Amino acid sequence: MASESKSYARRDRLLEIEATVRKWWEDEDVFRAESCENLPKPGEKFFSTFPFPYMNGYLHIGHAFSLSKVDFASAYHRLRGANVLLPFGFHCTGMPIKASADKLRREIEQFGNPPVFTAEDTTKVPEVQEESSDTIALPIPGQFKGKKSKVAAKAGGQVYQWEIMRSFGLTDSEIANFREPSEWLYYFPPLAVEDLRAYGLGCDWRRSFVTTDVNPFFDAFVRWQMRKLKSMGKIVKDRRYTIFSPLDGQPCADHDRATGEGVQPQEYTLIKMEVVKPFPLKLGPLEGKRVFLAAATLRPETMYGQTNAWVLPDGKYGAYEISETEVFILTERAALNLAYQNFSKNPQEPSCLVELTGYDLIGLPLRSPLSVNEIIYALPMLTILTNKGTGIVTSVPSDAPDDYMALQDLIKKPALQDKYGVKTEWLPTEIIPIINIPEFGDKAAEKVCLDLKIKSQNDKEKLAEAKRLTYLKGFTEGTMLIGEFFGRKVQEIKPIIKTKLIETGEAIIYSEPEKPVMSRSGDECVVALTDQWYITYGESEWRKIAEECLSKMNLYSDETRHGFEHTLSWLNQWACSRSFGLGTRIPWDEQFLVESLSDSSLYMAYYTVAHIFHDGDMYKGSKSLIRPQQMNDEVWEYLFCDGPYPKSSDIPSAVLSEMKQEFDYWYPLDLRVSGKDLIQNHLTFFIYNHTALMANRNWPRGIRCNGHIMLNSEKMSKSTGNFRTLRQSIEEFSATGTRFCLADAGDGVDDANFAFETANAAILRLTKELTWMEEVLDVESSLRTGPPSTYADKVFENDMNIALRLTERAYKDCLFREALKNGFYDLQAARDEYRLSCGTGGMHHDLLLKFMDVQTRLIVPICPHFADYVWRKVLNKEGCVLTAGWPPSNEPDLVLKSANKYLQDSIVLMRKLLQKQLSGSKKGAKKGAQVTAVPEGKLKGLVYVNEQFDGWRAHCLRILQSRFDQQTCSFPPDTEMLAELSATLLQEGKNLKAIQKVCMPFLKFKKDEAISIGTQALNLRLPFGEIEVLQSNKDLIRRQLGLEEVEIYSASDPDDVSIAGPHASLLTQNPPSPGSPTAIFVTSTSVCPPS
C-alpha cells in the first residue's frame, strides 16, 4: 500500500469515469423534465427544490451538503420510475453583491488599482495543510492562501475585498471589473453550473435563471407577487422597530447580515432618572437643561422598589442631547440606537455634549419615577455590561438578586466604599418590599441569595440560577404590595404601569438588537424606527392557514416541526422593502427594492415555466417566444392562481396552454430541502406565501431540514484554512468520493461531518469494487451454476432482500447515511461473508450477478456516475441506470436472518472458548474453577446445543408471551413484568437483586427480538433448529476455527454427552442454552467413540 498511498491513480480513474458518464448524460439529455397532458397520479411525478444560493462566490461544501439531500431524493424517485423535476436557480438580490462591489470601489479609490496595502493593512490567513490519509494522499488544488477571508470579514474586522477576490483565484486585472455589481451576476452563476454539472446534479438546466431586474421575466413575476399580496391587504406601510445598518442606510434583514441571523429587536422601558441640581463641576456644561441617567429595564413594575442606580466605574458614558431641553447620560452605543429612534436633537446623529466615565457619575443624587425614596444615588456596580442596555441600571434589591448582592458588597465592605468614594449616606438603609411571590415571600432576592449561599456579585453562575428561580414566578404568580395597583397580579399591571410611565413622560420606549448584528458591509447594526413596507406575517387568520398547511406537511423530523411551530408563534410583520442593493423595484413605490427574503418565497412556481422563458439562457431569455412585457398580472393569475383565461394577452394560446400545463402538472412542490437556519425566515415565508396565493391543492407537501456541515470535525472556515469549495472537493476527491462522503456525513438536524478520511476510503473502496466485478466477470464461466441450494446461498439472497427493503425505506425517509449503510456497507459485508462461507464449493453465478445488479442500482442516487458506468460498461446492460427501476425482491426471511446471526455469533463464541481452552484459562484457574487444557495440534470440535429454555429463562418467556400486545406490538412497563417474575422466583428462594441482575438483560433482549421478528421469538425454542443450522455449516465452522473435524451434539442427550468423555465437565462449567452453544475442543484420541 505504500506506493499506492502516494498515487492519484484511483481518484483519477473515477474522474475519467465521471467525464465519460457526463458526456453520455448530456448526449441523452437524461435530466430533461417534461410534463404530460394528464395530471400525474400519486408517485408518478416528483418535484423538489433547493434554496438558490447567493452568487457572491463559488459554491462550497456547505451548499453541497444541503443540495445533496434533494439530489439524492430526486434520484431515488427517478430510479423508482417517477417523472422528476429538479431545477436550480441563482440568487443575486439584496446587499451581498452590492456590498462587496462597493468595498472594491472604495479600496481602489483609497489604495489604487491594483491597490497597494501596507503590511499593517492585511492579516495573513494560515495556509491549508495537506491532509494525511492511510489510504490515498491527494493534492489540494487551489489552496486558499490569501489574506483574511470572507468568514473573517463576518467578524467585522478590517478585511479587504480585493484579497478575498484573490482567494478565488482571480487576477488583479479581473478583480477590478467586480466593482460593478453586474460583473458578479455574469461571472459566478456560469461557474456554479460548471461545478454542479461536474458534481452530477440531476438538474434540468433549461429552467435555470438569475434574480434581480437583469432577468426581466423574473422581475415581472416578483412585481406580480408583490401587487397580489398588497391587493389582499398582506403588505402595509407602517412604522416599526427594525434591525438597521447605519452604513447601508437601510434595514438589515437576515440575509444581509454577516453575523446575527435571526436576531430581533429587544424592547425596553427607558426610565428617566433626573439628576438633582446643583450639578457637579463635570456636568457644568449642561446647566439650563434637564439631565437624566437613562436606565433600560424589562421590569417597569418594579420601579417602586428602587433604592439606587448602578453605574460601571470604568465605563465610558456620554451626556447626549436628546432635545432642546433634555440630556440623557448613557453609553455611546445606546445613544446611537436612540438617534435612529427619533431621540436625538439631530436625527440619526448622536450629539455628545460631555464625555464621562462611571467615576464621574458615582454619588449623583437622582429623582426616579415611582420610587418610594424621594432621592436615590448612583453607586458603583462591577458586573455591568456596556454592550447591553444603556450602561445605567436601576437597582431593586427586593426582587433582583444581582442588585441585592451588589448592595450587600458595598454595605459590608468599607474598603470597597473607600475605593470608589462612596459616602455612607448614599447607601440605602432598607430594602423595600414591593411584590409577594409564593415560596419566596416579599423579599425574593434576599431569600434566594441566602438559600443558594451566594457570596458576592461576582458569583455569576449562582446569580443566574437565582434569577431563573425568581423572575418568571415573580411575573406569573407575583402580587403587588405597593402603589395604586396593590393586590393585583404583576402580569396584569405590568403593561399598564409601562404605558403610564410613557404617557407621563417619565420613560420612553427604547429598542436595541437582542444580540450583536454585523451587516455584510461591515458595520454594527442598530434598531431604527423606520417607515416602510411590511408583509403582515403573524396576522392571526393568515397564521392559522399557515399552521394548517404545516400540519399536513411531511417534515421528516420532530425537531423540524417544533422549529416551525415555534417560528409561527413569534414571527411578525417583515420589512419587505430596501433602499439599496440589487433586485426588483416595489411596483407602487419604486424608490424601494424588494428585499432578498421576499422575492424568494414563491419562485418554485416560476421554475415550472422558466424553460419557456429561458431555455438555457438564465438572464434575458433570448430564445423565448415571449416578451417580458407580455407577462402581466392577468397572465400570472391564469398560470398560478386559477384565474380566467387572459383574453387580452397576445401570447399565443398554445404557449399559454403549455405554461398552464407545466404548472398544473408539477405543482404542488413535493420536497424542499434546506439548512435548519432558514426555518426562522425563508422556509416559513415560503409556507405563508403559498397559503396566501395558491389553492389548497398546491400547498407544499414536504420540507427536509439538515444541520450545518463540519470538515474533519472542525467548523468550516476559510480563515483557518478548513474550507473547501465544491470545485476543490471534486478535484481532490472526485465527484463520486465527494457525494459518497456527503451521504455519509450525517442525517437529521444535528451538525454533520465531512471527513476527508471517508472520502479517501470511498475512492479506494469503489475502485476496488470495480476491479472485483471485472475480475469475477472475466471468470464467470467457472462459477457454480444450477439452482441456488446451499445454506450460504439462501442467506446471501436473503441478505440482498433485506438490504433492498431497508434501503428503500431509508431513501423514502430521506435518511441517506442510513441508505448508504444498508445499501452499500451492509451489502458489501453480506457479499464478503458469502464469499467466506462458500468454501471449496464456490460462489453461485446467478447470485453474484444479482448482487452486482442490486449493488449498482442501490447506489445510483449517491454515486450515479459510478453506477451508470458499471451498468453499461461492466454489466453490459442496456440504457441508463438512472431510470432502470428499483430491483425486484422477495419478502425477507427474518428467521433465516436470525439463524445466520446465531451462526456467526456462535463461531465468535467458539473461537473464544478455543482460545480459553488452549491457554488453560489462567483467569479461571485463579478463581479455582476446573478448566481442562487442550494440547496444541490437530483438534476436533464437539459443539453441544441445548435447544429449549428452562428454569428462570422459561419463566421470563412465559410472562412475555402472556403480556405481549400483538396489535400494538408492545409490552407493558418492565416494572410490571419484573413484579410478576419476582413473585414466582421469590417463592423458589431466589434473591430479588439477583433476579434483577440476571433476568432484566434477558427480558430486554427477548422483548426487542419479539418486536423485531414477532412472537416466535418468545418460544421456549429458537424459531429455527440450532442443530440443523450448525450441521449445515460444519465445514464453515471447521475452516473458521482451524479444526480438523467438527461434530454437533445435543446437550440433553446423555449418549451425546458421554462422547465428550473426561471433558464433559466443561458442559457443567459452561452449560449451553438456546442461542448459546458450548464447544469442547479435544484431540481425536481423547474422546469416547459414539456407542
From Swiss-Prot:
Catalytic function, reaction form: tRNA(Leu) + L-leucine + ATP = L-leucyl-tRNA(Leu) + AMP + diphosphate
Highest rank taxon of the organism: Eukaryota
Motif 'KMSKS' region positions after renumbering to this chain: 715-719
Name by which UniProt lists this protein: Leucine--tRNA ligase, cytoplasmic
Coiled-coil residue spans: none
GO biological process, one term: leucyl-tRNA aminoacylation
Record has rRNA processing as a keyword: no
Entry similarity comment: Belongs to the class-I aminoacyl-tRNA synthetase family.
Record localization: Cytoplasm, Cytosol
EC class (word): ligase
EC number: 6.1.1.4
Principal localisation: cytoplasm
Molecular functions (GO terms): aminoacyl-tRNA deacylase activity; ATP binding; leucine-tRNA ligase activity
Sites where the protein binds ATP: 718
Function noted in UniProt: Catalyzes the specific attachment of an amino acid to its cognate tRNA in a two step reaction: the amino acid (AA) is first activated by ATP to form AA-AMP and then transferred to the acceptor end of the tRNA.
Entry keyword annotation includes Zinc-finger: no
A GO term from the CC aspect: cytosol
Alphabetical keyword list: Aminoacyl-tRNA synthetase, ATP-binding, Cytoplasm, Ligase, Nucleotide-binding, Protein biosynthesis
